[in-house]
């Protein structure tokens, strides 16, 4: 697997490769063995990278259409989140940093279909929080507003013009990123709050 930079940071990730034999699915046994022991027993909030970002950043092997696994990926994520819900988590944070980029029509279509299906499958009491970062969401506000979220998080560090997007996001709760994840140790609180 290829390793590349996570957006424009100095962090790296292994690029997922999607091929004809790729069949994403959720395994509660594997999850119970490898992830469950690491989870906080307080069950505050479960966080994960969203499927739109995952698929957008994935690489197609042998010119295979990576978007052909959308339905299987939707089911895998939905099964995982229903499992998390049954563990007692009332808050789910889905991170979609790709929303700060120019999305392809396929990404936009996948976003709409995934979040529509997710809201149909989760208990209405489960609060879904959408987190964006690494860019301006202006081109994707309508898309974001078309889905139902308890809160939407906007990045003010990479692009402070997101501030003007607050009133255009159709969500009752907005959170704002004011601390740079690139250098959290050099934060000057006074200057940050003045901004």
Q: Residue locations for each model-derived region?
A:
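Domain-level signal for soluble alpha/beta catalytic cores
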Residues: 1-195
């Amino acid at each position: 697997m290829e390793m590349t930079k996570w957006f424009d940071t100095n962090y790296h990730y292994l690029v997922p490769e999607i091929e004809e034999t790729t069949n994403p699915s959720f395994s509660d046994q594997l999850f119970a063995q490898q992830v469950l022991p690491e989870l906080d027993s307080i069950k505050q909030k479960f966080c994960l990278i969203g499927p739109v970002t995952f698929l957008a950043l994935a690489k197609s092997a042998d010119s295979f259409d990576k978007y052909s696994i959308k339905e299987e990926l939707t089911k895998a994520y939905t099964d995982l989140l229903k499992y998390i819900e049954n563990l007692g988590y009332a808050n789910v944070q889905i991170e979609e940093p790709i929303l700060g980029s120019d999305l392809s029509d396929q990404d936009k279509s996948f976003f709409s279909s995934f979040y529509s299906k997710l809201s149909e499958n989760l208990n209405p009491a489960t609060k879904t929080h959408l987190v964006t970062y690494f860019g301006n969401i202006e081109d994707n506000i309508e898309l974001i507003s078309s889905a139902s979220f308890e809160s939407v998080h906007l990045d003010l560090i990479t692009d402070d013009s997101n501030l003007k997007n607050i009133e255009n996001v159709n969500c009752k709760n907005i959170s704002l990123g004011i601390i740079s994840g690139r250098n959290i140790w050099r934060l000057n609180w006074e200057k940050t709050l003045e901004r």
